[in-house]
Amino acid sequence: MAQRTRLGDILRPLNSEYGKVVPGWGTTPVMGVFMALFLVFLLIILQIYNSSLILEGFSVDWAG
């Protein structure tokens, strides 16, 4: 028999919804927000790599 934990009791309602499809948009807007934030993060990393984003006191030397 499985042991009950507080974390398991907290997560159980999420697991009970497994396989069910909620009508409408659901959490799609939240996913869109996180995708946009991830895109901004990638753009910042690309600009640092490309040296087009200049950070004071931070030198990027890729030669090793």
Swiss-Prot record:
Organism listed in the record: Synechocystis sp. (strain ATCC 27184 / PCC 6803 / Kazusa)
Keywords: Membrane, Photosynthesis, Photosystem II, Thylakoid, Transmembrane, Transmembrane helix
TM stretches of this protein: 28-50
Annotated function: One of the components of the core complex of photosystem II (PSII), required for its stability and/or assembly. May regulate electron transport between the quinone binding sites of the reaction center. PSII is a light-driven water:plastoquinone oxidoreductase that uses light energy to abstract electrons from H(2)O, generating O(2) and a proton gradient subsequently used for ATP formation. It consists of a core antenna complex that captures photons, and an electron transfer chain that converts photonic excitation into a charge separation. Required for association of HliB and Psb34 with PSII.
The protein's name: Photosystem II reaction center protein H
GO CC aspect terms: plasma membrane-derived thylakoid membrane; plasma membrane-derived thylakoid photosystem II
Phenotypic effect of disruption: Reduced growth under photoautotrophic conditions and increased photosensitivity; approximately normal amounts of PSII accumulate but electron flow from QA to QB is impaired. Increased photodamage to D1, which is degraded slower. HliB no longer associates with PSII complexes. Psb34 no longer associates with PSII complexes.
NCBIfam families reported in the protein's UniProt record: PRK02624.1
GO MF annotations, alphabetized: phosphate ion binding
Description of what induces expression: A monocistronic transcript that is strongly expressed.
Keyword Thylakoid among UniProt keywords: yes
Annotated signal sequence range: none
Lineage: Bacteria, Bacillati, Cyanobacteriota, Cyanophyceae, Synechococcales
Highest rank taxon of the organism: Bacteria
